[in-house]
Every structure is written in C-alpha cells, then in structure tokens.
Amino acid sequence: TAKLIINTMIQKYGHDEGIQYLVDLDKNVEVYTKSGSGPSKNIGTGECTIGLGFLHDGIFQIVDQGYGNIELVVPSSGTSCEVGATAIFKGAKHPNAAKLWIEYALSPECVELAAQNGSYQFLVIDNAQQPEIATEFGLDPNNVMDYDFEDAKNNTDTYVAEVMEALGGGDDRFETEDA
C-alpha cells in the first residue's frame, strides 16, 4: 500500500512535487503502519484521526468490525488502484491442483463468495456481481486515475528510496519488520 501511495503521488503531481507532497504530509503522520489495512484499524480504535489506505479496508472496518467513527473520503481527482493477483509457482508439487484452484479463484462464484465475507473491492472477473456496498460507500470504478503500471514496475525502488531519504529515513514512526 505504501509503495502504491508513493507511486500515486509521483504520477499524479510529478516527481519533485510528488515527493514534496509526501514530505509535507509527513508533518502530520504519527505512524507508518506495516499493513495497508492498518490506518483504518487505527482510526476505528481511536489511535489516529486520519489514515491513508484502501477504501475497501475502511468499508470492512465499518461494516464488519462495527467502527461507526470512520468516514471514507474519496478524492474527486481520482484514486489509484491495485489489481489482486494469483499465480502458480514454478515447480509446484501439485500443478494440476494449482490450476484447478486458479480456475476457481478466477470464477464469479469465488469472488462473489469473497464479497459476502468482507472483501469489498470492485471485481474484474467477467460476469461477477459487484458488491453493492462498495458503491454505497463511494467507490466508483470510473473515478480511477490513469495509473502507469510500467512506471511503477521500473521505478518503485528508486521512488521509495528517494522518499525515505527526503523523510530522513527510518525513525521510530516506521513500523517495519526485521529483514
């Protein structure tokens, strides 16, 4: 999630302005969480008042966890997005079973089951029923910026290093796991 936010700001505002936006925003950041769902959890428990993260995680906190103190704000200028992926590992011990799983995972039946169990993303599977609650909370598949996945693939490591350098890199607000 953090890498997506960094890429989004740089793509949206340009390289230098995007990094400066994140530096300016940093003045208001108490903690950088380990997980993308962390900000909405921290709002729900009252640990912070604003969080950046995926809208579907916020919906989950409101609907499934009962946090009525969360309000979702969708930027009118558009949001970025992520595309969930699934794959078969090269050399998998059971490739036929893995193929069957992939076929099921990419079926409308499977993604609709996920939506019934707290996964409120918009679906990209043909013929799948979109979770209505996502629209009720303001998610709009037409309000997505033209995200450059190729730029992200080629430059994410550099962008992250530049942002960390600009922020002064790794004080105790950054919740990281030991490598």
Question: How would you name each of these model-derived features?
Answer:
Residues 16-20, 46-49, 67-70, 96-98:
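Loop/turn elements at helix/coil->beta-strand transitions in domains of secreted/extracellular proteins
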Residues 39-42, 48, 58, 98, ...:
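Short, hydrophobic alpha-helical packing/hinge segments within bilobed ligand-binding/sensory domains
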Residues 139-179:
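Conserved C-terminal helix/tail region of periplasmic/extracytoplasmic solute-binding proteins
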Residues 1-47:
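Extracytoplasmic ligand-binding site segments that recognize negatively charged/polar headgroups
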